[in-house]
Amino acid sequence: MKIRTGWYSEYEYYVVKPLHNKQRQVLIMFAESVGGGRWNVGAGVFSCNVTYHSLTLSKVWRTPTSTNKNPSIITVKLALEALQEIEQVIAQDSQGKRRYIYVDGLDERRQRVYTKLLTKKYNYKKSTTKCTYCDLPMLYKRLG
């Protein structure tokens, strides 16, 4: 599923996993189009701002955009690997039990779109449970 987000970044893919530690951080893996068939793929650890229900950047890293004849093919492949990797991390952490995650799209529209992505494409289910730290709605998936 492709998500339109604005002129500066044509499409983005996000998967979010909370790291419910003392720093209240979340791990985000993403892929974003920068136009011309070029994509940035990356991941970041963000601090959860309880007051404003938003994410504050604390660390982020990206792969350099490929410069060969088919940049989009290679970098989209990396994007898919990033999404698979986050699924594996969640699966290992859950040990076959339900794993809850939450989505923060920085604004209400993005939050709805990311929630739809996870429920439709990645088979997450909506839950009445909310995030311990920021009261965002949780999604869950039985893994393993």
At which residue positions do the language-model features occur?
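Non-catalytic substrate-recognition and accessory regions of acyl/acetyltransferase enzymes
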Residues: 1-144
